[in-house]
């Protein structure tokens, strides 16, 4: 399995490459990350899209509409290291008004926990949006999924589990 993942915003490419290597080693999934700037941003090339930091606040109406189409057609949006519940809620309502945000625990999000990690002990703060009971938006607050130094690589396990579950159709 080989897919490209878009990194948009202030994403750490070195840590993204660690995530790629982690997935390849643990799941035999080969992923390539691609950084793209706003000038030539095209969401339709990517099944998985990372928006890092507050980059979601900088998206144009056109980008939001394209992102909406991609998510409704099955893409996965990961919002990494967002800061404000208020601005994220406004963005999610604009992006997917007909689908409510949820605050499920990580164990609920990852019913198929490939790495058998007890995420409840780690206390990630997240929001999600589901379409037909499939995770389509996952947002991590005040932490970066790419920071493998935190939590003894549990951030990598979290990201790997989300991507793995998405790729196998869960």
Give a label for each model feature.
Residues 34-39, 60-66, 121-126:
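Alpha-helical scaffolding within the catalytic cores
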Residues 21, 68-69, 94:
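Surface-exposed charge patches
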Residues 45, 72-73, 131-133:
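Short, well-ordered loop/turn elements at secondary-structure boundaries
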Residues 1-48, 52-55, 144-146, 152-170:
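Aromatic-Pro/Gly-enriched surface loop or interdomain linker
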Residues 48-89:
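Short alpha-beta junction capping motif
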Residues 29-37, 79-82, 101-109:
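Surface-exposed patches in mature extracellular/periplasmic domains of secreted proteins
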Residues 7, 47-51, 76-80, 105, ...:
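Structural recognition of the beta-strand scaffold that forms the well-ordered cores
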Residues 16-17, 84-163, 167:
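An acidic, glycine-rich "communication" segment
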């Amino acid at each position: 399995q080989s897919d490209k993942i878009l990194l948009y915003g202030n994403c750490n490419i070195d840590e993204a490459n660690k995530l790629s290597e982690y997935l390849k080693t643990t799941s035999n999934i080969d992923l390539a990350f691609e950084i793209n700037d706003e000038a030539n941003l095209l969401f339709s090339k990517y099944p998985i899209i990372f928006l890092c930091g507050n980059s979601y606040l900088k998206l144009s109406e056109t980008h939001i509409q394209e992102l909406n189409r991609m998510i409704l057609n099955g893409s996965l949006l990961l919002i990494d290291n967002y800061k404000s519940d208020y601005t994220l809620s406004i963005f999610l309502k604009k992006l997917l008004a007909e689908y409510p945000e949820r605050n499920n625990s990580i164990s609920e999000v990852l019913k198929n926990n490939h790495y058998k990690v007890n995420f409840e002990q780690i206390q990630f703060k997240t929001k999600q949006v589901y379409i037909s009971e499939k995770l389509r938006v996952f947002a991590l607050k005040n932490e970066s999924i790419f920071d493998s130094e935190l939590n003894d690589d549990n951030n990598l396990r979290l990201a790997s589990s989300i991507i793995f579950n998405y790729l196998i159709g869960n």
